[in-house]
């Protein structure tokens, strides 16, 4: 299973929690994680690598700015409100290795509560380039 996440040092802790929940709920599934980032510290990179290795999985750190320069001036996409990293997911076909035919993009500020194998293997139209689910919002009443 190929999983793509986007994070920088400010969200690495969130990424670690999400990845732990992913690995715990998908034991027995070999997971290859691609982290798209504009840079993380060596210490945080080691932490993520150790986490993935502890579960028998792998992580590839991708810093795609130079790859994307042939498609757009990525630095012009930066604003005071948004990091240019939010655009990385739009360019996944140009960032990921060619052998990656399918992947799940997961936000790092979530917790995976069930096995994702069924979702990952949903049959898609051969011409599909993207599939998405509707946003899911909990409508349960608040318990005070």
Sequence positions of predicted segments:
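Glycosyltransferase catalytic domains, chiefly GT-A lineage
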Residues: 1-144
């Amino acid at each position: 299973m190929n999983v793509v996440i986007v994070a920088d040092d400010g969200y690495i802790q969130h990424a670690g929690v999400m990845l732990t929940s992913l690995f715990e709920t998908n034991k027995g599934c070999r997971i290859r994680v691609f982290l798209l980032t504009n840079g993380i510290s060596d210490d945080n990179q080691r932490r993520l690598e150790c986490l993935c290795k502890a579960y028998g999985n792998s992580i590839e750190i991708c810093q795609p700015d130079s790859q994307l320069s042939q498609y757009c001036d990525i630095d012009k996409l930066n604003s005071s409100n948004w990091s240019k990293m939010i655009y990385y997911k739009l360019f996944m076909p140009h960032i990921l290795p060619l052998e990656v035919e399918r992947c799940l993009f997961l936000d790092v500020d979530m917790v995976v509560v069930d096995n994702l194998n069924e979702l990952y293997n949903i049959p898609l139209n051969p011409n599909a380039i993207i599939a998405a689910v509707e946003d899911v919002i909990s409508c349960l009443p608040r318990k005070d």
